[in-house]
């Protein structure tokens, strides 16, 4: 990568200004609200990803299916601001914030309206752009006493200071609850409590490709104390908003990316699942026994989550199919749950194995992620076989998904879908999404695929039952999934350390704007918990919106 060293004023507008920089780069500096500034770096006047699915137009709950035009700021209200310029620097001041841009060498500084600095770029070379790749880096100063929070589902202490954390999605079964990274979310939001001033702010990088936050792990003597966000692809396009209190930052992030979907009341009650139940040869009888045991022991069971075993033949899973040997009468079983007042949530996966009965039909629709030969599905390893992932930036895939969910699950009496295994771990550089008519590397859109899968599930449920508040769950995704779904900390492991550290992960997720969350009570992987561990985990689970015992 190469640093951007110098800038000059190119144009002014009612919201801010544009800088002309080295190597045909430009930087747009705009004030969207008195306490919200946006910085967008363009190469050759263009952005790499022309649309955003994380930031709706101002006042809208959601983006269009094909995303919002990234550079369109027209929905934001007019902001009263003052622009001043000298040969050495530019100043943009609102009633809440003052942004100063030093032009040579390039550096930005953010302060309150009274002049109190709360955030600054690194003194030397804060902006880097890849010359042979689409990578970039943004480095900011670390100050004594800084505290860092957020970044999604991160393990370990709540304060992330001193760590290097990846913004990426992985199927992290059995992760280390104190040190494991990454988990399931790509969440490039950092909440900073500035040490010297005590002022808190958030900085959100609206970028989907994989990246990382270095929050003081790296040290280079020539550059002083610094932290940075870097990504292997995409756009350096960030929103910086001042609290100024710590508790003010998360609501402002949600005002930007969309508020939490209001869940139905039943989803807040106790739920039960176990992977082994749906995998058992007599699965229907065993699952019916859950209803009977709950009644016998007076356990107020609100929901049962079906593991993917209802679709299994041997170790393989076939989405939107039923294994009628294990479930000879699935509709009758759903009626039993309904009569007991228990809702049913069924596991669904975005990949079709190549021997799935509908694989050829879906391939003929062009609804899979494509490989080097654009017309051919890209195959990858998935659940003891090879398969292809659905491309939710293709309307054909969305239609097929919603038809399958409606006919094969909702039509059988299932109440909701549980979007699982949606990290889109395809590591072929030539993997390509349809991009709603603009073919796009999958590397730019992994979190978007999980987000749109979840949206497709939610909207199919709403169409089937328009008078009921929809509910769905997703394991993976990026900022915006809170508009549709509940989520959780994934496939944890039985042990006191998981109970301890998952609580901190949950607090970090909540600070990141993921409010409807929880953890697998008792641990998903590992041995059976001892009685005290299970009791303590259940007591903690009562205090979470997702109150689910899973193994």
Where does each model-flagged region fall?
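N-terminal accessory segment at the very beginning of proteins
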Residues: 1-267, 271-275, 282-292, 306, ...
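Aromatic- and carboxylate-enriched substrate-binding clefts and catalytic-loop regions
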Residues: 61, 65-68, 302-551
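Generic secretory/membrane-interface signal
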Residues: 96, 153, 165, 229-231, ...
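Acidic (Asp/Glu)-rich catalytic clusters
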Residues: 258-261, 295-298, 506-511
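A generic structural motif
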Residues: 274-278, 521-523
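Short, acidic/polar
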Residues: 280-296, 398-407, 503
């Amino acid at each position: 990568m190469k640093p951007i060293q110098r800038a000059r004023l190119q144009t002014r507008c009612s919201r801010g200004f544009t800088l002309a920089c080295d190597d045909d780069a430009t930087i747009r500096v705009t004030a969207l609200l008195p306490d919200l500034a946006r910085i967008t770096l363009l190469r050759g006047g263009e952005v790499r990803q022309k649309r955003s699915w994380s930031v709706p137009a101002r006042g809208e709950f959601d983006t269009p299916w094909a995303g919002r035009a990234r550079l369109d700021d027209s929905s934001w209200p007019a902001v009263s601001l003052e622009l001043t310029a000298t040969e050495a620097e530019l100043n943009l001041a609102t009633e809440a914030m003052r942004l100063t841009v030093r032009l040579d060498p390039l550096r930005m500084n953010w302060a309150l309206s009274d002049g109190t600095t709360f955030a600054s770029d690194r003194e030397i070379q804060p902006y880097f752009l890849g010359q042979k790749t689409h990578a970039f880096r943004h480095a900011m100063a670390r100050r004594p006493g800084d505290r860092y929070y957020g970044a999604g589902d991160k393990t370990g202490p709540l304060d992330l200071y001193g760590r290097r954390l990846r913004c990426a999605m992985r199927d992290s079964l059995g992760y280390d609850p104190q040190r494991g990274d990454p988990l399931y979310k790509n969440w490039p939001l950092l909440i900073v409590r500035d040490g010297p001033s005590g002022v808190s702010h958030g900085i959100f990088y609206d970028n989907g490709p994989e990246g990382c936050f270095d929050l003081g792990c790296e040290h280079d003597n020539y550059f002083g104390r610094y932290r940075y966000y870097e990504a292997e692809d995409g756009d350096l396009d960030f929103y910086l908003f001042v609290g100024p209190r710590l508790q003010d930052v998360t609501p402002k992030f949600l005002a930007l990316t969309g508020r939490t979907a209001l869940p139905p009341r039943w989803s807040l009650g106790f739920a039960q699942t176990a992977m082994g139940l749906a995998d058992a040869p007599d699965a229907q009888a065993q699952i019916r026994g859950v209803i009977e045991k709950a009644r016998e022991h007076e356990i107020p069971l609100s929901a049962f989550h079906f593991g993917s075993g209802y679709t299994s033949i041997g170790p393989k899973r076939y989405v939107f199919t039923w294994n009628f040997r294990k479930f000879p009468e699935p509709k009758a079983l759903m009626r039993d749950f309904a009569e007991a007042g228990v809702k049913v949530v069924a596991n669904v996966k975005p990949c079709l194995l190549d021997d799935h009965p509908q694989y050829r039909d879906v391939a003929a629709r062009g609804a899979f992620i494509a490989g080097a030969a654009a017309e051919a599905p890209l195959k990858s390893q998935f659940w003891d076989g090879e398969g292809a992932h659905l491309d939710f930036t293709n309307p054909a895939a969305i239609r097929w998904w919603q038809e399958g969910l409606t006919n094969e699950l909702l039509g059988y009496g299932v109440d909701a879908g549980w979007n699982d295994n949606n990290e889109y771990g395809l590591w072929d550089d030539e993997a390509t999404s349809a991009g709603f008519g603009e073919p796009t590397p999958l590397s730019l859109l992994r979190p978007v695929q999980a987000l749109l899968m979840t949206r497709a599930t939610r909207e199919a449920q709403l169409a089937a039952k328009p008078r009921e508040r929809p509910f769905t769950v997703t394991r993976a995704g990026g900022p915006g999934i809170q508009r549709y779904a509940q989520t959780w900390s994934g496939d944890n492991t039985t042990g006191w350390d998981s109970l301890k550290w998952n609580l901190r992960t949950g607090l970090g997720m909540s600070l990141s704007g993921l409010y409807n969350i929880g953890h697998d009570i008792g641990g998903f992987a590992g041995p059976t918990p001892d009685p005290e561990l299970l009791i303590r985990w259940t007591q903690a689970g009562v205090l979470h919106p997702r109150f689910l015992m899973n193994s």
